[in-house]
Amino acid sequence: MILGIGNDLVDVRRIERTIERFGDRFLDRVFTEAERRRAERRSAAGPHSPRAATYAKRFAAKEACAKALGTGLNKGVYWRDMGVVNLPGGRPTLALTGGALERLRQITPPGMVAEIHLTLTDELPIAQAIVLISAVPAPQP
């Protein structure tokens, strides 16, 4: 059962300019420590740097997730409540905390478990994320 779908496009140049202008103030407000560690391993050299693209994809993922949750970035859902993480095989997903996790619990029907599916891509200067939140029957003991 699909609980929510969200999609977002971000101009990598916009994220690059925002980082140049606000630096750590922006990065600390929007991204989790794990996201920052991953992005900071990427090269910051040149226009449309891999570092900026990494941040842009994660920014788009947060926007898409907030849309899939049906709240946008309000109603107690904040940027750092949603963090892009990678599963052991490398596939990206979102780890939710705080208000985002609470909203996920609210929209998940009893007896079901929510699953978050995330796809990220970029074709410079655009980064895109699509989030699909589904509910599947909870495992039986």
From Swiss-Prot:
Location(s), subcellular: Cytoplasm
Binding-site residues for Mg(2+), renumbered to this chain: 8, 63
Listed cofactors: Mg(2+)
Domain of life: Bacteria
GO molecular function terms attached to this record: holo-[acyl-carrier-protein] synthase activity; magnesium ion binding
Predominant subcellular localization, coarse grouping: cytoplasm
This protein's UniProt keywords: Cytoplasm, Fatty acid biosynthesis, Fatty acid metabolism, Lipid biosynthesis, Lipid metabolism, Magnesium, Metal-binding, Transferase
Family annotation (InterPro entries): 4-PPantetheinyl_Trfase_dom, 4-PPantetheinyl_Trfase_dom_sf, ACPS, Ppantetheine-prot_Trfase_dom
GO BP terms in the entry: fatty acid biosynthetic process
UniProt name for this protein: Holo-[acyl-carrier-protein] synthase
EC class: transferase
Classification via Pfam families: ACPS
Keyword tRNA-binding: no
Annotated family: Belongs to the P-Pant transferase superfamily. AcpS family.
EC number: 2.7.8.7
Covalent S-S links between cysteines: none
GO cellular component: cytoplasm
Reaction(s) this enzyme catalyzes, per UniProt: apo-[ACP] + CoA = holo-[ACP] + adenosine 3',5'-bisphosphate + H(+)
SUPFAM superfamilies: 4'-phosphopantetheinyl transferase
Primary role: Transfers the 4'-phosphopantetheine moiety from coenzyme A to a Ser of acyl-carrier-protein.
